[in-house]
Amino acid sequence: MNHADYGPIGLLVIQATSLCNLDCSYCYLPDRQKRRIFDLKQLPVLLDRVVESPFWGPHLSILWHAGEPLTLPCSFYDEASAIVREQTAELQEQGVQIEQHVQTNATLINDGWCECFKRNRIVVGVSVDGPEEIHDTHRRFRNGKGSHALTMRGIQKLQDHGIPIHAIAVLTGAAMEDPERMYSFFRDNGIHDLGFNVEEQEGVNASSSMQGISREKQYHNFLKCFWECNQRDGFPIRLREFDQITEMMIGGKRLLQNEMNRPYSILSVDSAGNFSTFDPELLSVETQKYGLFNLGNIRDQSLVAATQSETFQQLLQDMTAGTALCRDQCDYYGFCGGGTGSNKYWEHGTLASSETCACRFSTQIPVKVLLEQIEAQGVKTP
């Protein structure tokens, strides 16, 4: 494999801070109680590392994520945005599109944050798991108090300011019990762009409430009901799981790889400047088999030089082997492009593996549900 098989970098994930003001029961991050902050003096260095490499492409999304980004002040993102504009001016003149995104629990959003998002053109993603008792079962402050009320207050602020949002809901066993209520919650609260992340066995979250054949059947029925409710109302909600599959089906497209297993499609950087590629959930994770997944630090290692490291070569070898297994063994390969390394590692102990519980939830079951709907009703898709 040569550098032509790497990139382009479409997503740059930066951990602004390791600290999170919540203590969600299913979180995979081990150090979310520690306040480690990304020094913005590192940002020009990081952007230079991207630009000097052969891996940059026509579009770059910078995502502030991992920890709660809004535990830092608005001024942090004002300064970061100014640096991004200055450092990428030449690229933008060449037609490269640069965007900033933030993924937040929304509990800290007020008018000041909304103004910050608007003046810096930051796209906002919100984490909300559904109705209060479902959300608050897992998404709590460290004092045990639920976060739902403050999350919904933050969402309302965004809507009052006319800021579009997309939402991610982590689905746990409790959410499976009433799909119509889950659907109505998002519809009635004006959340029209939604993705489901099924609770995963990952990082310090050593088990999941969504494991087992019975849960897979339940999720199948959940998605079927969600689709039918959405169709009944004229598809007010764009559900990521169906959108991606529908686009591929209608266009006759299939994936050969995905950004989670292609080197330098994603670049992830922690608060200390350590970087990795492939799946962002692998960043700064220490394991018995691979050691740290990190490839180096932006201060003293270029992206190209990192590809010569023993760590990169081992990760690439096993990731490639795992992707090949998926391609050879799985009928759904064209819809997922070989799965995600973090799920393979946490479920099988190696990247050189194939089917996971996570891929059955994220790809196989949505494909089955959508095919059933098409066969039963004809192609009536949003």
Task: Show the residue positions of the predicted features.
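Flexible mid-to-C-terminal extensions adjoining Fe-S/redox cofactors in radical SAM and related proteins
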Residues: 285-382
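Exposed loop/turn and edge beta-strand positions of beta-sandwich/beta-sheet ligand-binding modules
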Residues: 10, 58-63, 96, 263, ...
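Active-site neighborhood of divalent metal-dependent phosphoester/pyrophosphate hydrolases
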Residues: 67-68
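Radical SAM/AdoMet-radical enzyme domain recognition
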Residues: 47-63, 72-201, 205-212
